[in-house]
Swiss-Prot record:
It comes from Schizosaccharomyces pombe (strain 972 / ATCC 24843) (Fission yeast). One of its GO terms (molecular function) is histone binding. Binds to the catalytic subunit of the cyclin dependent kinase (cdc2) and is essential for its biological function. GO terms for biological process: cell division; regulation of mitotic cell cycle; signaling. This is Cyclin-dependent kinases regulatory subunit. InterPro entries: Cyclin-dep_kinase_reg-sub, Cyclin-dep_kinase_reg-sub_sf. It comes from the Eukaryota. One of its GO terms (cellular component) is cytosol. Pfam families: CKS. Disulfide bonds: none annotated. Keywords: Cell cycle, Cell division. PANTHER family: CYCLIN-DEPENDENT KINASES REGULATORY SUBUNIT/60S RIBOSOME SUBUNIT BIOGENESIS PROTEIN NIP7 (PTHR23415). The keyword Methyltransferase does not apply. The keyword Cell cycle applies.
C-alpha cells in the first residue's frame, strides 16, 4: 500500500512476470476458532523474486501486509471477506489470511435481505 493508503497495483509487465507461478499457488484447508476462519496460502518460493520490491517490508525483508487488491493482483484467488494479517516469518512464502467466522452466511443474508 502506498503512503496515501491506496493499494499499489501491479503494472502489466509486473503481472506478466508472475503468470508462470499462479498455477503453483497452494491453498490450505480452512480452520477456525470461535471468532475467525483461517487459511494459509503458500506461494512458490521462486515467485517471491518476481514480486516488486515495494510489496516487501524493508525492515523484515518479508512481504508486507497486502490489501485485497494487491494480493489478488499476485494471482491469489479466494472468496470474499479474507484479509491478509501476517506473513509466516520463518517461511516468508506462506501468507496468513483470516475472515470473520460465518462471513459468507452473514454476507449472503445482507445481500438477500
Amino acid at each position: 500500500m502506498s503512503k496515501s493508503g491506496v493499494p499499489r497495483l501491479l503494472t502489466a509487465s509486473e503481472r506478466e512476470r508472475l503468470e508462470p507461478f499462479i498455477d503453483q499457488i497452494h491453498y490450505s484447508p480452512r480452520y477456525a476458532d470461535d471468532e475467525y476462519e483461517y487459511r494459509h496460502v503458500m506461494l512458490p518460493k521462486a515467485m517471491l523474486k518476481a514480486i516488486p520490491t515495494d510489496y516487501f517490508n524493508p525492515e523484515t525483508g518479508t512481504l508486507r501486509i497486502l490489501q485485497e487488491e494487491e494480493w489478488r493482483g499476485l494471482g491469489i484467488t479466494q472468496s470474499l471477506g479474507w484479509e491478509m494479517y501476517e506473513v509466516h516469518v520463518p517461511e516468508p512464502h506462506i501468507l496468513l489470511f483470516k475472515r470473520e467466522k460465518d462471513y459468507q452466511m452473514k454476507f449472503s443474508q445482507q445481500r438477500g435481505g
